[in-house]
Amino acid sequence: MNEEPQVLYCDAWLMAIDKPAGMIVHGDGTGERTLTDYASDLLLAMGDGFAATDMQPLNRLDRNTTGVVLFSLDKQTQPAFDQMVIDRAFEKHYLALAEGKIDWNEKLIDKPIARDRHDSRKMRVGASGKPSQTRVKVLKRLKSRRGLPTRSYIDVELLTGRKHQIRVHLASEHHPLVGDDLYGTPRPCGLMLHAHSVSFTHPVTGEYIHIEAPCPWEP
């Protein structure tokens, strides 16, 4: 991991950071530096020790997924942000590169997701799972070139927030994400999945907020 996280937005109650590939959001017990550590150190450097102590991530991204991660900075307003997560009040869009040519232009993938009983690292589509909805729009179909196979550049809107949801849903459509080492085929480029934007009404100020993280790769 060479890139440093970048602050995209910050006020008294909320911070948004652009997470690079290779960094985890929360600690996993190994002592590895996390995005939460980075945000806490940044707040301490800004002289805001209370926020550095109180902060909580409002969303999480897999290690190799890049893009927007939100942090609540204030205990008093944390419940309001938590309720927004429950109410799905955050509109989240991802950019991704999927294997193969997707024939449809736009689709709502509505398939329940459960844990994979045969592999603890994975999730799967299954009737016993939790309701899960992903809206996918094809932005561009990329023809094979220079030895690369046909791929589809897509905009993905998360309507629910299950673990590995985008990866599982696209794999279930026979279009796994490029570079997905769990549900597809590993590639040198890594996982082509980027949390591009989040939009919401600020629970304190009432202001409409739209935050974007520039995509680190070209389709």
Regions found by a protein language model. Name each.
Residues 1-122, 127, 140-143, 147-148, ...:
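RNA pseudouridine synthases
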Residues 1-14, 20-26, 130, 144-151, ...:
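Pseudouridine synthases involved in rRNA/tRNA modification
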Residues 93-95, 106, 110, 133-135, ...:
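Well-ordered beta-strand positions in beta-sheet-rich domains
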Residues 99, 155-159:
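A structural micro-motif recognizing beta-strand termini
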Residues 136, 154:
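Long C-terminal interaction/binding lobes of large macromolecular proteins
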